[in-house]
Amino acid sequence: MAAVVDDKDRVLGVESFHTTRHGYRLMLAWMRSFGDLQRVGIECSGSYGAGLLRYMQAAGIEVLEVTAPDMHDRRRRGKNDHFDAESAAHAAFAERHTATPRSRDGMVESLRVLRVCRKTVVQARRIALQIIQATIVCAPDRLRDPLRQMTRMQLIRTLAAWRPDFTAYREVEDAYRISLKSLARRYLELHDEIADLDDMIEAIVKDLAPELLEQRAIGLNSGAQLLLTAGDNPERLKSEASFAALCGVSPVPASSGKTVRHRLNRGGDRAANSAIHIIAIGRLRLDPRTQGYVAKRIAAGNSKLEAIRSLKRYIAREVFGIIIRRQKQINQSQIAA
């Protein structure tokens, strides 16, 4: 559903289109039939609106992501697709409740897709292991006893190497053997798949920001998550303060009277916040400079949690600087090519 407003924010038309390339082409032609097209506002540009976002950007149209509906208008008029399209058009015209969307045409998008795939494979492997353990608990003693003292991978490889009689599946013990062998082979296949995905993810992270992995306590998973949060176009963030707010580590004032303090920021990308927290805890254990900083903040009257929140803010600043510098290098190399 799409709506068009004029330069006085009056609705000129509302129309429905299919979410296909042909539908996008018809939508763009319909919008341009009203005159010069200034900008387009899209809801859910990271999911259902991703295809439309890519099409509009390829056509050279300025695109804004509409981040939140007009709740006052929704309470007054209710909700349907017609009203939502009008609300998005009004938001794009006024440039309120909008943001520059992440472009989804670079290596960061490849990284995101691979990490989503890896997450589901890890979940499937964990489920397979849980079923193996539950099955062994219920297995006959003659099967269970030799497996008790084995480590996880010893157990999995032992079960995968079993050669049960597949024609005797009606017998209880043989049915257990068949089931455990099948589950163990599944676990090993998923384990190998995770290793392959990790190699691809590591290669992309090293291409995008090799300096990031050289920093203390920044591992592959944390670095990948921070690259995902920044996106393929980190320049859309106006400053490192914007990146800190996006990661949920910007200070939120919670002062009263003569007490000046800041509280936990519960907003932003919680996955990025978790990655920065892991980095902060790692540095607190390994980095003498970080240990000295936290000790200094505690001596000044801050709690340990408040000191860690300040540390997370500095980490966000450091990470953003690395990502932006690398992005400039990539852009310059593309221009030179």
What do the predicted segments below correspond to?
Residues 1-337:
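A detector of single, family-specific signature residues
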